[in-house]
Amino acid sequence: MKNWTRKEFLQTTAVGGGAALLAGNRVYGQTAPAKGSANGDIRVAVVGLRSQGKGHMLDHATKLPGSRLVAICDVDSAVLAARKADCEKVGVKPTTYSDYRKLLENKDIDAIVIASPNHQHSLQTIWGLQAGKDVYCEKPLSHNVWEGRQAVEAAKKYSKNIVKRARRTAPPRTSTTPSSS
């Protein structure tokens, strides 16, 4: 069995999380089918473009088949400009937004990846669902049970899917070498 480095584990789980979003109801048993655009690609927007968001942005721009990065959003204009340049280096030209509410008006977006600051996750998730988008949200989805329940109720009400990223870590491995006695 291969011993994974932390970096390999994180890369694998990040790509797996994106694949789970793309797979939609086949993985999580939701009642709403995951619908892409007419050409079969799922058109994705990434919100919050610093560390986690940058990784998601580059994954959807270059690594995930069936996923197409169509929009990016960040309130920091310097970060937004830098990420737009990163996308253009790999041949992707997403629409840019500094206002999340304007992004939600774009009917060409099928799914949203939320990697904004934690305190914005619940409301941005609910707004995304209300706008008819499936949502993949970095942890934490909410700061308390009530917020989490509101997001789940919104997913049911609008027949959309939520995928929340969760990392599980295993306890350190211990050697059980038999004693020589």
Question: Which sequence ranges carry the predicted segments?
Answer:
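N-terminal glycine-/serine-/threonine-rich beta1-alpha1-beta2 phosphate-ribose binding loop
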Residues: M1-C137, R149-I162
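A contiguous active-site-proximal alpha/beta segment in oxidoreductase catalytic domains
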Residues: D134-Y136, S142-S181
